[in-house]
């Protein structure tokens, strides 16, 4: 948003230098979706332990799916200026690839504000749970490539991220 003079952007979440949650009560609820991704890059010893089923804390892929679903529903507790919204659907996919573990989330709502933060939180929480469950195998595990892939709905319209190759 810009100020009436067109000089500088107007901060929507700060008034008089103080943070606030933007009032969305006048906005009509609309259907909105967001898809996000993250990567967990595995050193050889972590990948070997995962493939051999010798991970100290159990199956990190199953736990990551559940953690991502929970993360999508708890976003407003973690992101201070994020509105609590009804998550009407959430899917978290956790797949072992050559480059590491690829995590995607698709989150949907019918609300006056979007679900981008819920999708990003889902993949981030899932990735952190993978790290936690595999950290005994190596401290060189990396969480990488967290990004919004797409969104639909809302005043700002649809968004589609540029394609890029999988993480190294």
UniProtKB/Swiss-Prot annotation:
Annotated positions binding substrate: 81-83, 117-118
Keywords in alphabetical order: Lyase, Molybdenum cofactor biosynthesis
Active-site residues, record numbering mapped to chain: 132
Pfam family, one: MoaC
Reaction(s) the record says it catalyses: (8S)-3',8-cyclo-7,8-dihydroguanosine 5'-triphosphate = cyclic pyranopterin phosphate + diphosphate
Entry's Gene Ontology BP terms: Mo-molybdopterin cofactor biosynthetic process
Pathway this chain belongs to: Cofactor biosynthesis; molybdopterin biosynthesis
Binding partners and assembly: Homohexamer; trimer of dimers.
Enzyme Commission number: 4.6.1.17
Function: Catalyzes the conversion of (8S)-3',8-cyclo-7,8-dihydroguanosine 5'-triphosphate to cyclic pyranopterin monophosphate (cPMP).
The protein's name in its UniProt record: Cyclic pyranopterin monophosphate synthase
Enzyme class (EC, first level): lyase
UniProt family annotation: Belongs to the MoaC family.
GO molecular function, one term: cyclic pyranopterin monophosphate synthase activity
């Amino acid at each position: 948003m810009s100020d009436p003079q067109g000089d500088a952007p107007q901060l929507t979440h700060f008034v008089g230098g103080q943070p606030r949650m933007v009032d969305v009560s006048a906005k009509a609820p609309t259907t909105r979706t967001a898809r996000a991704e993250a990567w967990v890059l595995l050193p050889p010893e972590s990948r070997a332990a995962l493939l051999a089923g010798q991970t100290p804390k159990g199956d990190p892929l199953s736990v990551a799916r559940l953690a991502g679903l929970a993360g999508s529903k708890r976003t407003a507790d973690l992101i201070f200026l994020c509105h609590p919204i009804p998550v009407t659907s959430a899917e978290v996919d956790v797949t072992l690839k050559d480059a590491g573990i690829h995590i995607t989330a698709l989150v949907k709502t019918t609300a006056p504000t979007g679900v981008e933060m819920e999708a990003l939180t889902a993949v981030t929480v899932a990735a952190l749970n993978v790290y936690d469950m595999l950290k005994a195998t190596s401290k060189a595990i990396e969480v990488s490539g967290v990004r919004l892939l797409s969104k639909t709905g809302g005043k700002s319209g649809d968004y589609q991220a540029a394609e890029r190759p999988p993480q190294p």
